[in-house]
Amino acid sequence: MFKRVILIVLDSVGVGELPDAYKFGDEGSNTLGHVTEKTGVELPNMGRLGLGNIIPLKSVPENPNAICGYGKMAEKSAGKDTTTGHWEIAGLFIEKPFPTYPHGFPDEIIKEFEKRIGRKVLGNKPASGTEIIKELGEEHVKTGYPIVYTSADSVFQVAAHENVIPLEELYRICEIAREILKGDHAVGRVIARPFTGTPGNFVRTGNRRDFSLKPFEPTILDMLKEDGYEVFAIGKIEDIFAGQGITGKNHTTNNDEGITATIKAMDEIKNGLIFTNLVDFDMLYGHRNDVEGYAKALKHFDNRLPEIMEKLTKEDLLIITADHGCDPTTESTDHSREYVPLLVYSPLMKHGVNLGVRSTYADIAATIAETFRVGPTKHGTSFLKELPL
């Protein structure tokens, strides 16, 4: 039926707290609801699909003539980070949360890291990425010591000025950290966070790189690759899956590049999965509590969505979702435990349909598996037969 699936993750665009959000300190979080409420941003193209039918949105009205399948999905895994969310979308459950470090990393980890890289480190504490380079950037430039920090997520982040520690050296340092952080200290991701500028004017660049754990079981990506389908990763998708199950990649660094790369891939890849992560919502605006910036990023995606839609054929299935929340209207600058939106469209569809509340993100993996007749996946329930085709 379908020869191609285009799967787009709007990073952090959650649609309301999950029932267990209180366990994560995220009561009341509603990323999309609060951003539309505070800014009044209009999203007519996603509204046409049925975005306003998923939850009440102040500036995106419910659409009785929605053209796609719409609903929301709960995260079944224990977590609210990028790796957990994307792995569940691909069919894996994380039953034990990745370790977090609210007081910084233990001495044995830091000492081993310093020994292996031949440098001391600065920081070693939870911090906002923009704030810690303000605080320690000048000392880093003087000493050449990389800045190590973490957050509420399972991440070991290494910040360095590109003129002090060149990118390839920073990436090598992060690969060493990835080798060290295993067993009980197997954090979800090691992240390179390069920056440039001068004291008082440091700015992070787009040359971020994620070094994820390898998935511990086959994902839908592996199943597709093994059956000879293309799996093309855009944005940080290849990093999130540590290259596993990927046949091609484009490491875009922002939403605009990611959308353009998706459109280009649709011209070139005719059989398989195009899997895109659009990171700006989370990286630039959610974590920085920038409500207006978040709204502008939503508007930008909505404005460019027709470019993707017009390239769809009757052999295509488009799925738009998210991996977690990151509500910029709350005091927290961390991810939030939320439902994520589900928008599913093909030109073959006769009309829109309410896909309801799905119990796991893995329903996407199950649907892709049924579409390409691979699998079945270990988790998830396909919604393919619920679409009015």
From Swiss-Prot:
Record-level Gene Ontology MF annotations: magnesium ion binding; manganese ion binding; phosphopentomutase activity
Residues annotated as binding Mn(2+) 2: 282, 287, 335
Cofactor note (record): Binds 2 manganese ions.
Keywords: Cytoplasm, Isomerase, Manganese, Metal-binding
Residues engaged in binding Mn(2+) 1: 11, 323-324
Listed Pfam families: Metalloenzyme
Record field: catalytic activity: 2-deoxy-alpha-D-ribose 1-phosphate = 2-deoxy-D-ribose 5-phosphate; alpha-D-ribose 1-phosphate = D-ribose 5-phosphate
GO biological process: 2-deoxyribose 1-phosphate catabolic process; 5-phosphoribose 1-diphosphate biosynthetic process; metabolic compound salvage; nucleotide metabolic process
Pathway given in the UniProt record: Carbohydrate degradation; 2-deoxy-D-ribose 1-phosphate degradation; D-glyceraldehyde 3-phosphate and acetaldehyde from 2-deoxy-alpha-D-ribose 1-phosphate: step 1/2
GO cellular component: cytosol
InterPro entries hit by this protein: Alkaline_phosphatase_core_sf (IPR017850), DeoB (IPR010045), Metalloenzyme (IPR006124), Phosphopentomutase_DeoB_cap_sf (IPR024052)
Places the protein is found: Cytoplasm
Cofactor: Mn(2+)
EC number: 5.4.2.7
Enzyme class (EC, first level): isomerase
Entry function: Isomerase that catalyzes the conversion of deoxy-ribose 1-phosphate (dRib-1-P) and ribose 1-phosphate (Rib-1-P) to deoxy-ribose 5-phosphate (dRib-5-P) and ribose 5-phosphate (Rib-5-P), respectively.
Entry's family note: Belongs to the phosphopentomutase family.
Protein name as it appears in the record: Phosphopentomutase
